[in-house]
Every structure is written in structure tokens, then in C-alpha cells.
Design a protein with these regions (language model features):
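Substrate-recognition element of Asp-dependent hydrolases with the DxDx(T/V) motif
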Residues: 65, 74-111
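Acidic di-acidic motifs
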Residues: 7-9, 137, 155-156
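Metal-dependent phosphoesterase signature
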Residues: 29-30, 38-79, 86
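A structural signal for isolated positions on well-ordered beta-strands in alpha/beta enzyme cores
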Residues: 87-89, 131, 152, 169-171
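Asp-based, Mg2+/Mn2+-dependent phosphohydrolase catalytic module
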Residues: 146-147, 157-198
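Short catalytic/ligand-binding loop motif for oxyanion handling, primarily in non-cytosolic enzymes
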Residues: 13-15, 97-101, 141-143, 161-163, ...
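Active-site neighborhood of HAD-like aspartate-dependent phosphohydrolases
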Residues: 1-52
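Substrate-recognition "cap/lid" segment bordering the active-site pocket of phosphatases
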Residues: 96-150
């Protein structure tokens, strides 16, 4: 049984709408900003309010994470993988609390999102809590991927994939296809995953 490791933030989840809505609710951005995390960040940076974005991240990843969308087609793709005999493990670089702002328990929030989205349901993905790992540093994340014997790892950050042992099959999830300088296998949509593994 092959083990597939999965990143969490911006790989299983899509925060674009939630970043936009939370920033609007806090009156941090005008309405005409694009409903994307990057657009919100770039706007706040352009008006010298980068600290507000750091605060916003804590809100989104903590207090409001339950409102985050699934990455399009992700859940169906993971069901397909399980049907083909793959074992799923989630390995995320996620600190317990945000860098700034209120001390939301980010890991607890992520578990609640996974629960809400049927990752633990017997009639869903039926993952166990010990299939989920949150690590405090990128280095510990890389170690965990190795310890859990992941043969494949999917992440939205090429800098993470660059650190992973090249004997592990590394797949870059890049919905906007904006990481062309990297030679990893790449998917823009989760629906493409099965075809590049077969």
C-alpha cells in the first residue's frame, strides 16, 4: 500500500474567498479587490499594512477556518486514491498559535475543518487522528514526511518540495500554474492527480 502525504493549507483548502470576506468584514480592503488571498495581501502591502495581513492570517486560519472552502475536486480525488489502495497522511507545517493577534489554536481549528469536511467520517475518508501531523517548523515537517514513509508528497510550496528527499515522488499543486521554473510533477486541478500516478 503506497503512502501519499498531503500538505494542508492551500492544498486541501482554498482560502481565497475567506481572506477576501474576512478582510472586507474588518474594513481592511475596498470591495473592488479581487477575491484572492494574494490580491488581499498585495493590497495591504501596497498601503504599508503588512502587519494587518499577518493579523488577518491568524483570523482566517484560526477563528474562521471552518468557513474555508475545499480545494476544487480535492475530496473526490482522495476518495479515488483510497479506492485504488493508497494510504493518506496529512503532514503540515502549522504552529499552534498565530504569530500576531489573538491566540487561536490553529491546529485545533484545522482538525475541526477536517472533521466538518468528512475526513474522519466512516462513510467518508475515514482517516484517524494519528494520520494527521502538525509540525512547528519546515524542518520538522520534512522529517515527519520521511518518518511516515511517504512515497508521494503533494504540496503547494515548491520550496518545501525542494527540501524533500528526491526519492519521494514530489507533486506540486499549482492551481494558477505559476511555478513554471520547477521540474516537479505538477497538477493544476485535483482531478488530474490519478492520471499522473497511473
Amino acid at each position: 500500500m503506497k503512502i501519499i502525504g498531503l500538505d494542508f493549507d492551500n492544498t486541501l483548502t482554498n482560502y481565497d474567498n475567506l481572506f477576501y470576506q474576512t478582510a472586507r468584514d474588518l474594513a481592511l480592503i475596498p470591495q473592488n479587490i479581487k477575491s484572492e488571498k494574494v490580491a488581499v495581501r498585495n493590497y495591504l502591502k501596497s498601503i504599508n499594512k503588512e502587519d494587518e495581513f499577518t493579523f488577518l492570517q491568524g483570523k482566517v486560519y484560526g477563528e474562521r477556518i471552518a468557513e474555508a472552502d475545499q480545494a476544487k475536486g480535492m475530496y473526490e480525488a482522495l476518495i479515488d486514491l483510497q479506492c485504488k489502495g493508497y494510504k493518506l497522511k496529512i503532514v503540515s507545517h502549522k504552529t499552534k498559535y498565530p504569530i500576531k493577534g489573538y491566540k487561536y489554536d490553529l491546529r485545533k481549528g484545522a482538525i475541526e475543518w477536517l472533521s466538518k469536511n468528512k475526513f474522519f467520517n466512516k462513510n467518508g475518508l475515514n482517516l484517524k487522528r494519528d494520520d494527521i501531523f502538525f509540525e512547528s517548523t519546515k524542518e520538522l515537517k520534512i522529517e515527519r514526511i520521511f518518518k511516515e514513509k511517504c512515497e508521494i508528497f503533494i504540496d503547494d510550496l515548491p520550496e518545501i518540495l525542494n527540501l524533500i528527499d528526491p526519492r519521494i515522488d514530489r507533486i506540486l499543486y499549482s492551481p494558477k500554474n505559476d511555478n513554471n521554473k520547477y521540474n516537479f510533477k505538477k497538477i493544476q486541478e485535483w482531478a488530474e492527480l490519478i492520471s499522473i500516478l497511473d
